[in-house]
Curated annotation (Swiss-Prot):
Biased composition annotated in UniProt, kind: Low complexity: 18-37
Keywords linked to the UniProt accession: Acetylation, Phosphoprotein
InterPro entries hit by this protein: GRAM, GRAM_domain_protein_2B, PH-like_dom_sf
Modified residues (Phosphoserine): 238, 255, 265
Source species: Rattus norvegicus (Rat)
Name of the protein this chain belongs to: GRAM domain-containing protein 2B
GO molecular function: identical protein binding
């Protein structure tokens, strides 16, 4: 009768405190040595084994009672720990929720502010430039300055089909509207030969330089993305032809000549003219950014002229190579073009060397002329000194002869003056005597 409630109490303790190590140990011990397990096994075993297990059961009851005595304290500690952990998890979850809400609010505010600023910029853009249709939105605006006789600080507006600039300096509005399809050149350049913050935008008739760009690379990429025809032209001028073009050229007959000296003579003239212009630029002292930019622009123009002329003379070359290689391989063409460019460069260098030689010869002639002139001037100076010496020796006796009468004349002049002074003094004394005699005569009468 006593053994059954013990087993029930063991089962209750085992379910109430599953996490404590002591209880788990006691539970395992009690589960193996409990009287209920003894009764279940005794039904299948003999009486000797039952007696042995009954002798073990009183010893197994002592740890279970101690564990039951310790269970209320453990329950309290576990309850407090679970409450504190639950409160901490609630606080952490609240903080995380607050952070996520603040981030979401800041993102929404930023989106609203950016959308409002973009809307205002779009309205301002369409208000300034009436040529741009209202259906075309503004893509981006950049702060920059237009370089002319002075810098016009303003903004560069870029839309899908227009590149516009607006500036207001000294109450004067400056507006520039450039259609994207009319742009022929977009190039990076430097301000004052040092600062890389400028762009050149050129059309067929005009050329504009925009400086003080804070983000030049992003501006350049955006303008290139808008002016897609420039990329198409650059791809069209590439030296690698397509496979279909190569096959077509390979099938054509090779009855054309291979001598192009007459055709490249015009190119030599153009190159020579450009070289003279570049030498003129280099001979000038200080260069302004405008002169550098204009030089770059002229160089690009000459390059386009060379590309056009090469494009005109390209089919005969490709036909000739097509006749030699009927398989249609175009790997020889770039090498041929490179050899031509190398030949042109060698010609230019060979032309530059004689010019340097002529300059050195000219300087040597000038130095020789200066040396000869110095010797001649020295000879003339010596002859003049000799003549002056002879003239001074001739003039010395005449000067001695003239000094003697002049000294006598000066002495005579001194004697005359002394005599005049004495005579005047005597006359004065005589007048005094005469006056005294007249007074005496008057008194005597």
């Amino acid at each position: 009768m006593v053994k059954k409630p013990i087993s029930s109490s063991d089962e209750v303790f085992k379910f109430e405190i599953p996490s404590s190590p002591k209880s788990s140990a006691g539970a395992s011990h009690s589960s193996t040595d409990s009287p209920s397990s003894v009764f279940l096994s005794s039904e299948a075993e003999n009486g000797v084994e039952d007696r042995k297990r009954f002798s073990k059961s009183p010893t197994a009851q002592s740890p279970t009672s101690s564990v039951e005595a310790e269970s209320p304290d453990q329950k309290r500690s576990l309850g407090l720990w679970s409450k504190s952990s639950f409160d901490g998890s609630n606080l952490l979850s609240d903080k995380n929720d607050c952070k996520t809400e603040s981030k979401a609010d800041s993102k929404t505010e930023r989106k609203k502010s950016s959308s409002s600023s973009q809307y205002k910029a779009n309205m301002h853009f369409h208000k300034l430039f009436l040529d741009v249709p209202t259906e075309e939105p503004l893509r981006q605006s950049f702060t920059c300055a237009l370089q002319k006789e002075i810098l016009y600080q303003g903004k560069l507006f870029v839309s899908e089909n227009w590149i516009c600039f607006h500036s207001k300096v000294f109450g004067k509005d400056t507006k520039i509207s450039i259609p994207a399809f009319s742009v022929t050149l977009i190039k990076k350049t430097k301000t004052a030969l040092l600062v890389p913050n400028a762009l050149i935008i050129a059309t067929v008739t005009d050329r504009y330089i925009f400086v003080s760009l804070l983000s030049r690379d992003s501006t350049y990429k955006l303008l290139k993305s808008i002016c897609g025809h420039l990329e198409n032209t650059s791809v069209g001028n590439s030296p690698n032809p397509s496979s279909a073009e190569n096959s077509f050229r390979a099938d054509r007959p090779s009855s054309l000549r291979l001598d192009f000296n007459d055709e490249f003579s015009d190119l030599d003239g153009v190159v020579q003219q450009r070289r003279q212009d570049l030498e003129g630029y280099s001979s000038s002292g200080s260069q302004t950014p405008e002169s550098e930019n204009s030089r770059d622009f002229h160089v690009t123009e000459s390059q386009t002229v060379l590309n056009v002329t090469k494009g005109e003379t390209k089919p005969p070359r490709t036909d000739a190579h097509g006749s030699r290689a009927p398989d249609g391989k175009a790997k020889i063409l770039p090498a041929h073009g490179q050899s031509e460019t190398i030949g042109i460069l060698h010609k230019m260098e060979s032309r530059k060397c004689p010019t340097l030689r002529h300059i050195l010869i000219f300087y040597a002639i000038i130095v020789c002329a200066l040396i000869i002139s110095t010797f001649y001037m020295r000879y003339r100076i010596n002859t003049l000194e000799e003549r002056l010496g002879s003239l001074t020796s001739i003039m010395d006796p005449h000067s001695t002869e003239q000094t003697a009468p002049s000294s006598l004349g000066s002495q005579v002049q001194l004697n005359v003056e002394v005599l005049c002074q004495e005579l005047t003094a005597n006359i004065v004394t005589l007048e005094k005597i005469q006056n005294n005699l007249q007074k005496l005569l008057e008194n005597g009468d």
